[in-house]
Amino acid sequence: MPQGRTLATYSVGVKFVADEDSTMLLAMGATVDWTSFTDPKYGTVGKRFIPAGTAVAITAGKLVVTDNIKVTYLMASDVIENPLFYRGSDDTSGLYAGGIFFEDRLPDSTAGFLAAGTKTAMGSNFVFQQSAGLLVVGS
């Protein structure tokens, strides 16, 4: 590298995925059952937003809030209830069925950790680690 120049390296892609090559995706994803997402953190009816990385289960072929009993996945994309008025996808999301993820960057983590029941429902296909900062700047 020529002297006097600085090279900055930034992490790109989904910010909670630790290793893209480790991820397993559920084939076609699933459609959101909006009646399941009633917690105020998702917003109000007609304007709800579910961020990528949210832990979900599938009931009757639709994505629902995980009950920590059914097999649990992570949403691969943001979903917005009314995409005609807001930026984002429609009512469907791809799903991560496993891989290596930054636990502290998931929207359901509290103080950097997922609930034990959620992690149990995800099974052994998911490996979690702390991000400890992602930005690497070198010269």
Which residues fall in each region the model found?
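Surface-exposed, low-hydrophobicity beta-strand/loop segments enriched in small/polar/acidic residues
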Residues: 1-139
